[in-house]
Regions:
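N-proximal low-complexity "stem/linker" segments adjacent to membrane-targeting elements
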Residues: 1-29
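Conserved donor nucleotide-binding strand/loop of the catalytic core
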Residues: 36-41, 51-85
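Acidic helix N-cap motif at the loop->helix transition within catalytic regions
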Residues: 18-22, 48-57
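Acceptor/aglycone-binding surface of glycosyltransferases and processive sugar-polymer synthases
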Residues: 69-85, 90-93, 99-152
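A conserved acidic beta->alpha catalytic loop
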Residues: 43-52, 98
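Donor nucleotide-sugar binding loop of glycosyltransferases
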Residues: 16-19, 46, 75, 101
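Conserved hydrophobic residues forming the short capping helix/wall of the S-adenosyl-L-methionine
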Residues: 30-31, 54-58, 112
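Structural signature of the Rossmann-like NAD(P)-dependent dehydrogenase/reductase core
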Residues: 8, 43-46, 68
Length: 152
């Protein structure tokens, strides 16, 4: 790993003890040998063993960095703090619950390589999501609320 990675993968987590090891493994499998990268996990004061499992993973995953909030601040703040801590010029974000496939990151990297220099953002669109009904309802509500507030 270079002193300054080319890509930072930011992953906010809260109570994801069963998901951190598989997701770290998937990120490493997708990126190691392709690009110099770091993985920045931001633990938003998990009450389970998420932090301990991340610390254990650091022993075998040199790309892994772990940041912990002192108090619960929410997913958006965790992403923001992860981005601020990132050392690479390019940043990918993944949800800590495994809903995003790290294998898609190389596809975005390939598109970036073909793009004009003025292009600064690459994004994917998830299909066949596995979200619960309550999560879909909450997402829809937040989007509609933001739309109403932006018109005021």
């Amino acid at each position: 790993m270079r002193a300054t990675p080319q890509l930072s993968v930011v992953v906010p987590v809260h109570n994801e003890e069963d998901n951190v090891a598989p997701l770290v493994g998937e990120i490493v499998a997708a990126l190691r040998g392709l690009v110099d990268f770091e993985i920045v996990y931001v633990d938003d004061t998990s009450r389970d063993s998420t932090l301990e499992r991340l610390r254990d993973l650091q022993a075998t995953t040199p790309e892994l960095r772990v940041i912990r909030h002192l108090s619960n601040a929410g997913q958006s703040t965790a992403v923001r703090n992860g981005v601020k801590a990132a050392r690479a010029p390019w940043i990918a974000t993944l949800d800590g619950d495994g809903q995003n496939d790290p294998a898609d990151i190389p596809k975005l990297i390939a598109e970036r390589a073909k793009a004009a220099p003025e292009v600064k953002l690459f994004a994917g669109w998830r299909v066949n999501r596995q979200d619960s009904g309550s999560k879909r309802w909450a997402s829809t509500w937040r989007i509609k609320r933001a739309a109403v507030l932006s018109q005021q």
